[in-house]
Amino acid sequence: GQPAFMDIAHLCAPLAKLLAVRWTIGLRTPGHTVAKLLNPFEAHAVQGVRCVQVVNHTHPEYAHSLTDYLQLVQAHALLMRGTEGEPVADARRQPRFDVFLNGQRHAGLSRAPEEGVLVELPNLPDGHGAAVTAAYLNDVMRGSKPLPASIAAQADCLVESLNTLAAP
């Protein structure tokens, strides 16, 4: 299928208003956590569509409440500390990955964080602009630049989790 996008204002106008408060106070609100937990694919689980939702937190304290939530709703999820609020592993260092299947932490699929001093940094672009990022992603997709190990580990963790869900 093709990627789809729906503005949060159309999905839930009150949540959109709460998210907009960030631009007034300069901080994310609990509304950002609620928005991250929205999972449009869960509605298709009855039809056999399986997904492992990537749930990220910015502050370590949120890991506890999100763990409680994922257990309560019996989620299939990968919980991790995100990068700049996004649900992607830091390209410089692998964060801890906690995998939940049916709300239970799966130790065999979860991964410990990379600790200690970084001795080598991945070859990343010099800027953060859209054009620079797009060019870098194209290079990675073509294989002319390597995918950072931490992001490859996140992808592997998700594939292994989906395979575990699909197993009889």
Model segments located where?
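Glycine-rich anion-binding loops and their surrounding alpha/beta cores
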Residues: 1-168
